[in-house]
From Swiss-Prot:
GO terms for biological process: metabolite repair; nicotinamide nucleotide metabolic process. Its EC number is 4.2.1.136, 5.1.99.6. K(+) binds at N78, D145, S181. Binds 1 potassium ion per subunit. Residues 77-81, 149-155 are annotated as: NADPHX 1. Keywords: ATP-binding, Isomerase, Lyase, Metal-binding, Multifunctional enzyme, NAD, NADP, Nucleotide-binding, Potassium. ADP binds at residues 454-458, 475-484. SUPFAM superfamilies: Ribokinase-like, YjeF N-terminal domain-like. Bifunctional enzyme that catalyzes the epimerization of the S- and R-forms of NAD(P)HX and the dehydration of the S-form of NAD(P)HX at the expense of ADP, which is converted to AMP. This allows the repair of both epimers of NAD(P)HX, a damaged form of NAD(P)H that is a result of enzymatic or heat-dependent hydration. This is Bifunctional NAD(P)H-hydrate repair enzyme. It catalyses: (6S)-NADHX + ADP = AMP + phosphate + NADH + H(+); (6S)-NADPHX + ADP = AMP + phosphate + NADPH + H(+); (6R)-NADHX = (6S)-NADHX; (6R)-NADPHX = (6S)-NADPHX. Residues 417-423 are annotated as: NADPHX 2.
Amino acid sequence: MLSRLSERCSIATGLEQVLRRHVWSAAWLRDAEPAAAASQNIDLSCLMERAGRAAYDVFSNLYTSQQHWLILVGSGNNGGDGYVIARHAREAGKIVTVLCMPHSKPLPAEAASAQHAWKAVGGTETTMNPGAPLQLPADVDLIVDGLLGTGICGPPREQYEDVIRHINGLPVPRVAIDIPSGLNAETGEVAGACVKADHTATFICLKPGLLTGQAKDYVGQLHYRSLGLEDWMTAPERMRAALCRRVALDDVYEYFGIRRSALAHKGRCGKVILVGGDHGFGGATLMSAEACVTVGAGLTRVLTRPEYAAPLLTRCPEAMVTAVETDTGGQLEQQMLAAFEWASTLAVGPGLGTGAYGQAALTAALRHAEVHQDKTLVLDADALNLLAGRLHGKEGGAAAGAGKHLPVLPNSIITPHPGEAARLLACRVADVEKDRLAAARRLAAILGGTCLLKGPGTIVHCHSSAKTAIVDAGNAGMASGGMGDVLTGLLAGLAAQRMHDTFNTTCAGALVHGVAADMVAAEDGRGTRGIRATELIHRVPLIVNASGPSPATRQRSSGP
């Protein structure tokens, strides 16, 4: 099944594969483009020609039967790419209609050159009339978006928004040049109207806004083209300028390519304690435990309420269960501290609740992890809500220190969804989603460890190393209860095995989680609606034991 996912990927050269695994700021690229062109002994107009031609090749291969292309050009270099596409489409025998936005300033030199070349082959254009209804030829069967580029911040101007909303409502395929108009290339924020593209062709490097935030709803399928700049982009100084890693399907082979030693035994494969399952929330720890066992942890023990011991052992007899009966805070904490001595990895949160049981579990976990800095501590769900209370003096946090004594835990992993992140940062969910990369950095600083910020385009950030990754796997079917509990188990089980450092363990766990969901969705064309969290667990062994790809398969890209 994993190989079938790989088979859907496009062919890429070795250096292109390197570039597809990294992400650069759009602002950095705009500043670097003159040097990039100079490295090829060409000017920026020639670089624009390469971009337009690359986009035309992508779109024409995707839409071989579309005969009337509508190309919308703005007043910047994105519009210049549109003129190049228009020229190539016309030369290929397509009917081409070019509509341009009115602009008070002259076009940039490169865009003006592309416009001149379009007109030189007999091309024409029509300037749109702001406020007037948009009149389009009835037989248009492909719309090419070249309105706005990577420099946009905030909502488009009203005249652009009107056009964007109009074309989004048409039953015609839409493709975007470099980035859908209205999408923030740095953050993935959509502050106003944004083109909903079926496909996007982007150039030279991947930008963060194409992979996270609201991007998944607007980019469609992403196609990356390096424009012949692979050697220049992979030079050490450019690689050091990369903003973050992109973690995707091919990285499965990097994370899990080393086989387990034939001399391994359960004691060497890690001892995990999972704490959760307060009264009324027993299913969460069950799913976490099953995921932890399935991903390869040597020994897994669950601390939960007595009523969940039998169901858990029935469903997952490989796990051990310790029933926590007392409701007295001090006794709870002491019982948990004693149990934690056995473990090499702790995970606290699934079904934890925010009462005395949860408070005691979090206090004990933080105390133990502060003393045993070599152990990994995973915090999720109500453990994060309780942590937020301590940070901001709410819900009993004052009694627990109100954030005054939070330890620095470099090996900790916190896994908030946007709502939990907002509580931890004392802000609105919209503030988290406005810039997910910045939010992840702030979240990781709380305990000085690694943050996994959930959501489309999961962000992983390590505070101590300042490393960041965007995990490009998973789908909308993961919007269901229990998914986070499965992730917690995966992270704890992987951390216990000590295959990688905490940052890479977190990336690997998020990748396994997302790829498992993609496998479920791809099976027999099932789709994303109605995926259950427990279904992911059964795909995990296929991922973590995936054979390395053949040399031919290694040339395939797991994404754009």
